[in-house]
Amino acid sequence: MDTQDLLQNQNVLVLGLAKSGYAAASILHEKGVKVVVNDQLPFEENEPARILAEKGVEVVCGSHPTELFDLHSIDILIKNPGIRYENVMVEEALKRGIPVWTEVELAYHLTDAPFIGITGSNGKTTTTTLVYEMLKADSKKALVAGNIGTAASEVANQASGDEWIVTELSSFQLMGTYQFRPKIGLLLNVFDAHLDYHHSRKNYELAKQQVYRNQSETDVAVVNLDDETVVRLAECSKAEKVYFSVRRTLERGACVKDGAIMFNGEPVMPLEDVVLPGEHNLENILAALCIVKTAGVSDAAVRKVLTSFTGVKHRMQYVATIKNRLFYNDSKATNILATKKALSAFQKPVILLAGGLDRGNEFDELKPHMSFVKAVITFGETAPKFEKLAEEMGIQQVKRVDNVEQAATAAFSLSDEGDVILLSPACASWDQYKTFEERGDMFVNAVHMLK
């Protein structure tokens, strides 16, 4: 798509200079689009702002002056996905009827390359990685983008028309899309998450539904038959539906039958040959299979990946065995469902390290999955809630610490040979760490210090 035609004579305000905002501002400036950047961080502390200013981009830092809308006759606002809609600049834009994009929408307008859009409450990163690796294993041209790493607009700006752009999409990113239309769209699952941001389950579902909403008859919607909400939300899509199910046998789509992974009634490979740990990953595998078979990937390429792929960093990542204690980093478990799945993967004593940003959740849903938990080490804003949970479960060994580094040390001191020490916080990291990656890296480093 021709960005200059779309944004001709348009004035764009980029709000927030994390990686997506920086990428959007840089690309628009390079294409000659009139752009101004606004970021809360003071200019002298803001390296991305200084780089943009050196390029000739107008940058306003340290506050959010609504005067910018009139001063620059703003037509479109592109915001960092993490910035809430209660932000004064976002509220002002909406009040004026100005579209509020995330850079995923911009990415869509930068290229004719087909998008594979992958979203869901859990499993996005693993599924995105599986799809990308399977495409590459079959010598398909593919790029990976979005919530998983490189900003979508940066990838799209470099993509050729015959490359698949495999894009991990959060609800925050999707909420700021208008015309974004993935050639293949997937909603893995839906449950209560990010309600502090979206304010209601309905709003959260509407954001997730954007992965399907703009699809046409020539597109494909991959649908989880085991999730009633996903099935309902997919009804808006005009695309061909391709289904997968962990629980039932399907003649069309992906499932498991007689110990084999199946697609359209034909065996792809024995389930026992899959090396990716955890039953919860079967959902991700079947979803990825639907996507790549739609894209023409061979069974041989699927088998090549599934017999070697052991998982992604920060998602049930094996870290080390120290004195016969097994350490796992599941820092990407930023919600309750992810931690439920992590706990269900082990049939031996577990020391759970949990806590983080308090979004108002209670954690009673974890109780049925805590039968193997022998101790809880907790930290962050939700520490009191996890202490209460442990008490209600009759867990005697409970300790509150300041951070994940201390949690690793405390867990090791409480552990016995054969124990699993599992960081699976069930909470976002933002009360103490910039990202779940930073939290996970701090934990991994602390574990290695125990050797």
From Swiss-Prot:
Biochemical pathway: Cell wall biogenesis; peptidoglycan biosynthesis
Predominant location: cytoplasm
Reaction(s) catalysed by this chain's protein: UDP-N-acetyl-alpha-D-muramoyl-L-alanine + D-glutamate + ATP = UDP-N-acetyl-alpha-D-muramoyl-L-alanyl-D-glutamate + ADP + phosphate + H(+)
GO CC, any one term: cytoplasm
EC number: 6.3.2.9
Residues the entry annotates as binding ATP: G120, S121, N122, G123, K124, T125, T126
Listed InterPro entries: Mur-like_cat_sf, Mur_ligase_C, Mur_ligase_C_dom_sf, Mur_ligase_cen, MurD
Keywords: ATP-binding, Cell cycle, Cell division, Cell shape, Cell wall biogenesis/degradation, Cytoplasm, Ligase, Nucleotide-binding, Peptidoglycan synthesis
Protein source organism: Bacillus licheniformis (strain ATCC 14580 / DSM 13 / JCM 2505 / CCUG 7422 / NBRC 12200 / NCIMB 9375 / NCTC 10341 / NRRL NRS-1264 / Gibson 46)
GO molecular function, one term: ATP binding
Family matches, as SUPFAM superfamilies: MurCD N-terminal domain (SSF51984), MurD-like peptide ligases, catalytic domain (SSF53623), MurD-like peptide ligases, peptide-binding domain (SSF53244)
HAMAP family referenced in this protein's UniProt entry, alphabetically: MurD
Protein name: UDP-N-acetylmuramoylalanine--D-glutamate ligase
Taxonomy of the source species: Bacteria, Bacillati, Bacillota, Bacilli, Bacillales
Subcellular location: Cytoplasm
Family (UniProt): Belongs to the MurCDEF family.
Recorded name of the encoding gene: murD
GO biological process terms on file: cell division; cell wall organization; peptidoglycan biosynthetic process; regulation of cell shape
Domain of life of the source: Bacteria
Keyword Cell wall biogenesis/degradation: yes
Role summary: Cell wall formation. Catalyzes the addition of glutamate to the nucleotide precursor UDP-N-acetylmuramoyl-L-alanine (UMA).
